[in-house]
Amino acid sequence: MDKNISFTLKVWRQRGPKEKGHFQTIPVKDMPGDTSFLEMLDIVNEELINKGEEPIVFDHDCREGICGMCSLYINGHPHGPATGATTCQIYIRRFNDGDTITVEPWRSAGFPVIRDLMVDRGAYDKIMQAGGYVSVNTGGIPDANAIPIPKPVADEAMDAAACIGCGACAAACKNGSAMLFVSAKVSQLALLPQGKVEAARRAKAMLAKMDELGFGNCTNTRACEAECPKCISISNIARLNREFISAKLKD
């Protein structure tokens, strides 16, 4: 059984997107090591409510590393110190007794703060609406199994489809670029026969929307790849660049 640890929680508090924020320091005593990070925040919030104080606002849903909503910057890393894991998959045992744990929201022009640790990630939805889908008729459900796709290609498309749209890539990037997200969504479709028909339009539309929403440009620092909880490869960015250049040459 994991031992209990005590630490200092330094949490960003901000009442709204236009308000000035500040850090609140909260001492946490004897937290069991097998408590998940979000469970710890639940416990802290319960104590704050009992004292008549405002609870910490943070986003969450599945708590299984699938939805991407638990987007927190922990000790300078998106989703915390673990590799290939989301915030909800982080446990208190990863920290040491006496540590100061700093928790912040995503810092990106494309993700305005709603309150405290919750940001508006609707920009990613708008990018998806610009072209992250297949709209042409690809036949019925059984027809997909009738189209031969090489196993390596199918695996590569599946790897790209692992992206959960959490926003860690844009938050980690010094330019606030969403290229890893866009490239993963373009790749998962561009690699498959069903997605090739609209490949040119998709690449141009999704990149245009990304630029419109205030995300920066990629300068290949690879911070996105290092911090991605699903280990999405930046080789997808190279593919997106090829798709975009090919599409522009056809204009």
Regions found by a protein language model. Give the residues of each.
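Short structural boundary motif marking the start of a folded domain
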Residues: K3-L9
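Short polar catalytic/cofactor-binding loops
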Residues: V11-P17
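Short strand-turn-strand beta-turns centered on an Asx-Gly dipeptide
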Residues: W12, K29, I74-G76
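Short, contiguous acidic and Ser/Thr-rich linear segments
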Residues: F23-S36
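Ferredoxin-type iron-sulfur electron-transfer modules in oxidoreductases and energy-metabolism complexes
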Residues: T35-E54, I101-D251
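Short, structured protein-protein interaction patches enriched in aromatics and acidic/basic residues
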Residues: V57-M69
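Glycine-rich phosphate/adenylate-binding loop and adjacent beta-alpha elements
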Residues: I74-G98, V103
